[in-house]
Each structure stands twice: as structure tokens, then as C-alpha cells.
Amino acid sequence: MIKWLARPADYASVWDAMKTFTAARGPGTADEIWLCEHAPVYTLGQVGRPEHLLNPGLIPVVHCDRGGQVTYHGPGQVLAYTLFDLRRAGLYVREYVDMLEQATLATLRELGLEQACRKPGAPGIYVPQPGGELAKIAALGVKVRNGYAYHGLALNIDMDLSPFLGINPCGYEGLRTVDLAACGVRTSVERAGELLAAQLARAHGQAVQQRAAALAGVPG
């Protein structure tokens, strides 16, 4: 199931809802994708270091249980929270992250951003800039509890990027961030979110089907 949350969504409230959903689910619970835009907020992951918060100003900071360092969420950015049963899909965490990245790349290509790419050793999706620099356009951060994943990814659509200057994005000093608008792609948060959710649902559904076929002894 794919659903949009009320916007702007309060980060702490959505995080609590994800934890509640995950704690209550069982083997038969359907997977869900939650889409939203957040009010401005910095989030610091489990291994996040305070020194990467350079100048948060008046933007609130939330320490959460996802992986990764610090990032920023705000209007003009779509969040896709993927509440997936990884055991049902037969996915390890690394395979799951790869699936999220591949689905994001497919979405960007569908939107016409063919040059988007991954960066070895640095999760997320990047766009080459003049001079060869890679600027980050999508950030990933996940949590897996008892085989159930939550949190997900953030894709920059058309937003005020200046709050990223108040942090070392994802723990990398001087890492540049970019959005679709700056890359010449004009689209809405709603359209980008729907395309992204469709790619994520398709990729995860294929993994679930392949896992079921393997357990049944049927060639995939």
C-alpha cells in the first residue's frame, strides 16, 4: 500500500508511527510505503556525530534510530518511508539498500536525469557537476528490526538547499547537495513521489515473488 501523509509532516510523529507499525506487524502484515514532505528538521542517525552539526540555527534537531549521520529534511523534498518485510523478500540489508538505490536511479531516469549515479562507499544517489564533483540528490537511511525495515530515503525535488550548509551532509565535510530543479528537471513533489513509490513497490514486489518461487521450488 502506498499512502501520502498529511503535509508538512512532523518528523518525530512520523518516526513514532513507523516504530508502532513495525512493532505491531507480523508475517502476514502487508508492506507499506509512506510518502511525505517534512517541516524543516535536521535528523541525526544512530552513529551521528554532533560535530557534523555546524550551525543548525533555529531548525530543530532530532536524534533518531536510522543508520547514517546527519541530514536535512524540508519542503520541496519527498520522503519515501519503506516499511518492508525483508525476510519475506529474502533480502539482506546490503541487498535492500542496493534495491533502494536502483529504484531511485530508475525514477530519476524516468524523469529525464540520465546522469544520476552511485558513489562507491557512500550510500545515496549523486549527480556529476561541472569539474567532476558529485553532488548528492538523494539520501538513504534505514533501520531493520526483527527483519522488518523502516525509515527509507529522501529525494530533493525543488527546495531551499541552504540548510545543508549548516551541516556536514551525511558526515562528509563540504559535500554539495543538489535538487532536480537545479539539474533542469521541473516536476512536482507529488509526481516524483508517485514515480518513486511505484519503482520501490515494483522492485520489492519482484523480490518477494522470487523468494516465494524459490521456497516453492519453482524456477524464477
Swiss-Prot record:
Belongs to the LipB family. The gene is lipB. This is Octanoyltransferase. Pathway: Protein modification; protein lipoylation via endogenous pathway; protein N(6)-(lipoyl)lysine from octanoyl-[acyl-carrier-protein]: step 1/2. Pfam families: LplA-B_cat. The active site is at C170. The record marks K136 as: Lowers pKa of active site Cys. The lineage of its organism: Bacteria, Pseudomonadati, Pseudomonadota, Betaproteobacteria, Burkholderiales. In the reaction, the free carboxyl group of octanoic acid is attached via an amide linkage to the epsilon-amino group of a specific lysine residue of lipoyl domains of lipoate-dependent enzymes. Residues 27-208 form the BPL/LPL catalytic domain. It catalyses: octanoyl-[ACP] + L-lysyl-[protein] = N(6)-octanoyl-L-lysyl-[protein] + holo-[ACP] + H(+). It is found in: Cytoplasm.
